[in-house]
Amino acid sequence: LPVLLRGLRDTVSDLAAVVTVADDGGSSGRLRQELGVAPPGDVRNCLVALAGRKRLAEVFDYRFEAGEELRDHAVGNIIIAALADMAGSFEEGVGQAARFLRIKGRVYPAATESLTLVVRYADGTTTRGESVVHKVGKQVSAVAVEPGGLPAPDAVISAIDRADIVALSPGSLFTSTIPSLLGGGVAEALARFDGPVVYVANVMTQAGETSGFSVSEHVRAISDHIGPVATDILVHSGDLSDDLLARYERENAAPTVVDREALERMGVRVREADLLSDDESRGVRHDPAKLAAEVRRLALVRL
């Protein structure tokens, strides 16, 4: 999501991001456990992506490298936790952080309190917690959140209702994308939305979580959880280098197969474009400008 936000921030006048609060690992997990605050890490990443005050954004992203208590904590996570505690509301704390950073857009947590991810695997077993999924390494079949039935914040529903286009960004399908859509009222808001709902397909599968998944299986997983909301699919069209493929093969990941006929049978339009960064040093990464340009193009075509 931050990659897409960085691409859109200077070209879209009214930008809103909805961010999962099911993270329970790393700095976010420690703050969640010790302070009872909703995990701020994913929210922080989106705030930083939209920040107008670049130096302050660098402070938010700074991580302590020493000290038993502060090691690996992101400064921004601590600030958001403090603001939420002072305001008595995680949602308001995020809003205050957004004003500090002078973000270009709005960032909304998908829920007003911490959620716990409940994961069901293809073999019928279940685990609780987002951070254990990749350690388990088994094929995921479905996820839910606890407590269940919580309504999404009113601001989230309002943002969907007012949108010209909704983009489901690339990322971990079962531990990031789908959990952000499970708040009460979100599925209904997307079902009545009459604009394009664009799913930006992951270029690579993830070991265990989506091993062997095609693009249509990603879309079907979203549909199984909230209904058939996607109208358009955006996929990368270029080839990957042999070195890059070998690097991901060692991680039990492979390119996501674009099964166009299956997608068209599901009633979704497929758009292929060059979406990746030319810099392969950090692996397969979407290019913010390329990705944003294609999302904007889809919005213009469909409006």
Can you say where each PLM-predicted feature lies in the sequence?
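C-terminal functional extensions of proteins
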Residues: 212-303
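Conserved phosphate- and dinucleotide-binding cores of soluble alpha/beta proteins
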Residues: 9-11, 19-36, 137, 152-153, ...
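Glycine-rich phosphate/diphosphate-binding loops and the adjacent beta-loop-alpha structural elements
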Residues: 61-89, 171-178, 204-210, 240, ...
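Active-site gating loop/helix substructures
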Residues: 109, 113-174
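A short, Lys/Arg-enriched amphipathic alpha-helix followed by its capping loop at the start of a domain
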Residues: 3-14
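Electropositive, gly/pro-rich neighborhoods at or near active sites that engage anionic ligands
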Residues: 22-138, 294-297, 301
